[in-house]
Design a protein with these regions (language model features):
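A short, exposed helix-loop element centered on a Lys and neighboring polar residues
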Residues: 111-112
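The beta1-alpha1 cofactor-binding region of Rossmann-like NAD(H)/NADP(H)-dependent oxidoreductases
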Residues: 51-62, 93
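Conserved hydrophobic beta-strands of the Rossmann-like cofactor-binding core
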Residues: 8-11, 76-77
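A glycine-rich helix->loop->beta "capping" turn
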Residues: 65-76, 84
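Conserved glycine-rich cofactor-binding loop
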Residues: 15-16
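Substrate-binding pocket helix/loop in short-chain dehydrogenase/reductase
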Residues: 87-88, 95-100
């Protein structure tokens, strides 16, 4: 990775696991890091926004909060996701749809919103 540039970084699902480790790395490089979370708030030291990435309104509100706090998002890490720990034969269509919405559709949703801000800042 290059030297720190103070870039604005948004990491969805940044309160734990891989998302938190990624947030910590960007912060160590001197970047301004914002994280979204749904159920578990991140540790102190990050600008955190509660956001259900399956909701377009929540995603838009989260981006607005980050943009007000830091400015336009320059780097997006779409990390939020979920799983239903069950066998396929036990999984209902609603369960499957919920997983797809959180893991696939949400990535589209946040990437589209990030691109809008990135193009404006260009």
């Amino acid at each position: 990775m290059s030297e720190a540039t103070g870039r604005v970084v948004l990491i969805t699902g940044g309160s734990r696991g891989i998302g938190l480790a990624t947030a910590q790395r960007f912060a160590a490089l001197g970047d301004r890091v914002a994280v979204t979370y749904n159920s578990s708030p991140p540790p102190e030291g990050f600008f955190a926004v509660k956001c259900d990435v399956t909701s377009s309104a929540d995603v838009d509100d989260a981006f607005k909060a980050v943009e007000q706090h830091y400015g336009p998002v320059e780097i997006l890490v779409s990390n939020a996701g979920m799983t239903k720990d069950m066998l396929l034969l036990r999984m209902s269509e609603d369960d499957f749809t919920e997983v797809i919405d959180a893991n696939l559709t949400a990535a589209y949703r946040v990437a589209k919103r990030a691109a809008q801000g990135m193009l404006k800042a260009r």
